[in-house]
Amino acid sequence: MKVHFDRTYNHPMEAVWAALTDARAIRQWWVDTDFRAEPGHEFFFRDKPQGKWDGVVRGRVLEVEPGRRVRFTWDGGGHQTVVEFRLEPAEGGGTRLLLSHDGFRGLSGLFLATMLRFGWGKYVNTILPETAKHLADKGFGVPFDRPSKAATVGIAASA
């Protein structure tokens, strides 16, 4: 089973890439992390624990085409899956994001994929484009207009 999103944003590829791959931006729109878009880098994504899940997803960056594509493992919720973000110039300007999250197996994989489809949808439709817009308009030098996602769920940001 696969989770897939195809979205177009009216923001430059550089801003969308930064929103997806720079830990400072990821903390803003998603979760606490030490992510770096470098092949072989092992990282974590830390969210608020829920039920038996400790809130931590671990992964390793598999492939990077700087500014265009990053592919990494996702080890969380009892499943090992693979996520890919691919960016393309959009017709008429802006950036097209193709997100795929693949490798879900069995009934528990179906359940996890359903939950992640909801979560990814929320992020790619609202918070990610807001973050990319901020980066395109103001960069990292100007504080974001709202608290980071990591802060709103009570997660202390990493250095």
Protein language model features and the residues they cover:
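Tryptophan-centric aromatic hotspots in well-structured domains and transmembrane helices
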Residues: W17-L20, W29-W30, W74, F85, ...
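A conserved amphipathic terminal alpha-helix motif
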Residues: G103-A159
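Hydrophobic ligand-binding cavity/cleft-lining segments
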Residues: M1-D34, V153-A159
